[in-house]
Each structure stands twice: as structure tokens, then as C-alpha cells.
Amino acid sequence: MTACWIAVTNAGGAAGFPFPPVDVGHVAPVVDALADRLDPDRSRILVARIGGSLAGWVVLRRDASPLIAHWGVVNHLQTQLTYRNEGIGSALMRRLREVARDDMRLEQLHLAVRGGMGLEAFYSRLGWRVTGRWPGKLRLAPDDTRDEVLMILAPL
């Protein structure tokens, strides 16, 4: 997962590290922290493999608070660069929806994407809808400020 995340980030992907380049020293501790928080009821990592190799992965989390325990948050969807445009991301998101609904008993999913990357269109094709945006929230460089776009998938 670490190698995938490094490659995706350094290729300009919006997967959690906004300031490339990154290396193992940046990414490995974050992957370790994700793994440490895994819990069947609250946090899962779904992976896609092709021929035994990691093709992509995504994180699904549920908050511990009973107030919002009915919805999940999706983070870090990414595919290996060699498997781009082969439907891996879409397949991961379809499977994530099933896991959220059938295994974790979630009722809705939320995510936030970086504006200006075409991600809204990708998620919209999978049934997600935009619920709002934080204009100018993400400052990637002095001359590159983007909206953070909030999306929901409901019902599952």
C-alpha cells in the first residue's frame, strides 16, 4: 500500500498527501496508523489484487459516536498507476458500498474530494451526489487554491 500511495501522490493524485514529492518516510507511518486502527465494526481497508499484486485500495471508517454511527466516511481511494482506467477504482467503490451496507450496516457514506480534478464526475457515475463545497479551502500552492467538494451516497 505504501508504494502505491507514493506513486499515486507523486503522479499528482489527490489521495491524502497534498504536497509531493513524498517517500517512504512520509507515507509508511500513515499506512501503519491506518492498519493499527482496523476494526471490523469501525474501520476497514478494501484492496483489489490482480495476479497477486496490489492494484488498488480504499479506506472505510465509521465514527465511534452513536450520534453519527449510521454513516461512514470513505478515504484514500487509489489505484496503481499501471492499472489506471481499467475499472479498479469503480470496482472497489461498488464493493465498498456492499461492505458498508451488508457487513457494517451503514446507511449512508460521505467523502470529500479536491475540486478541479474531475473526481465529482467519477463518483457521480457511481451514484454519489454533491452536497456542498468549501470554496477555496485547499491551498496547494500560492497560485493554486481549490474547493473541497462534499459528496454523499445514500441510500446504500
Where are the language model's segments positioned?
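Acetyl-CoA-dependent GNAT
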Residues: 3-76, 80-81, 93-95, 99, ...
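Conserved beta-strand-loop-alpha-helix junction that forms the acyl-donor binding cleft
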Residues: 84, 109-120, 137-142
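Conserved active-site alpha-helix within GNAT-family acetyltransferase domains
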Residues: 86, 90, 102, 115-133
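Conserved GNAT acetyl-CoA-binding A-motif
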Residues: 93, 100-113
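Terminal substrate-recognition subdomain of acyl/acetyltransferases
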Residues: 111, 129, 134-156
